[in-house]
């Protein structure tokens, strides 16, 4: 393993100007460059060395917020909004590709880049906003996991919320076993989720001709205000700010070398990994919408927007008790996956922005305590309806923070002074700027709608 800041003899490390501060110790230093890259094997074997981090990122694109918008879109408008799911995924692929480029080119994750590029009076507010986003993310995962436990085992929501604290032990165990073990668990759970939805879709028997047509955009999406509103929700719930910090940190678990040629190859293979993984996330999100369209919209149930109602309707509509059980299992797996990745994102944010390095269990306990307390209070006082409202609030908080992660990412990767010859091409920056503008505008609109109570 090559220590951070050094390079093997005979290889010249590429360093760039343009930063206010010198690069410090890497975040998650216990796993930094711990996974060997096969540099002498075939292209396939070298690419396989980078296989993994993209799937941890893909978890963030299958959170309960995405489930809710996909259920609403499918139940109300059938397959028509599949094109929007595809568009939002393409946006995500582009932004996550920039994350890998930033990390490999500069040796910094997004949090470190913000710290080293901006004065403290800007960097510290960005850190506080990022921490708020991590807490909101964890809150959503607590609620999603608790709902999954309730639907699958009948455990009361308030008890399920408290039980989510147990995953601290799971995270600690996995981190001690090595980063590849973490990736293996995540990919296994994603496989379970895919199997659950594949089975449910086979049961639902969707109209595949209509499914294919749904991936082609139509003018009705813009001309129909109700359809446009749901479409905005799908796009607005797609890119999660913590994923940008997470991806730029965990891609550096690979020991990819220090020369420009080695870094170019690392960017190429890491981008391939995330693109394949996000395509998998696209399949899952499309599956949720297809399931809702085939099960709910086709039978006249056009108002299914929350997880409880969807679960309750699957049994009578599909004529099988297996379908709702699979739905609950998939939700629970999503919750477990997300708690692991949210922990890592929280560690990267804290270490990257302010260089405070807590023991993983302390960091995890603090984040989970902040999430459990409001979730427990709301479930005790207001029940399942309260958790639904809290879930919506967590998505609004994430929307508020998103511009403060996306905009620096696009700016950094465009600057040759910081990135050198590995800076993003002008056309990539142009597309990324448009993507960032669209996401920011849509999120601002969703926030406006949340506080005014009605779409504009």
Curated annotation (Swiss-Prot):
Native organism: Brucella melitensis biotype 1 (strain ATCC 23456 / CCUG 17765 / NCTC 10094 / 16M)
Segments traversing the membrane: 47-67, 77-97, 123-143, 151-171, 184-204, 227-247, 276-296, 316-336, 369-389, 392-412, 422-442
Subcellular location, record wording: Cell inner membrane
Family membership: Belongs to the NRAMP family.
Gene: mntH
Membrane topology annotation: Multi-pass membrane protein
Covalent S-S links between cysteines: none
Protein name (record): Divalent metal cation transporter MntH
Short name of one Pfam family: Nramp
KW Nuclease (keyword) present: no
PANTHER family listed in its UniProt record: NATURAL RESISTANCE-ASSOCIATED MACROPHAGE PROTEIN 2, SOLUTE CARRIER PROTEIN FAMILY 11 MEMBER
UniProt-recorded Gene Ontology molecular function terms: cadmium ion transmembrane transporter activity; manganese ion transmembrane transporter activity; metal ion binding; symporter activity
Function: H(+)-stimulated, divalent metal cation uptake system.
Keyword Transport included in the entry's annotation: yes
Biological process according to GO: iron ion transmembrane transport
Keywords, in A-Z order: Cell inner membrane, Cell membrane, Ion transport, Membrane, Symport, Transmembrane, Transmembrane helix, Transport
An annotated GO cellular component: plasma membrane
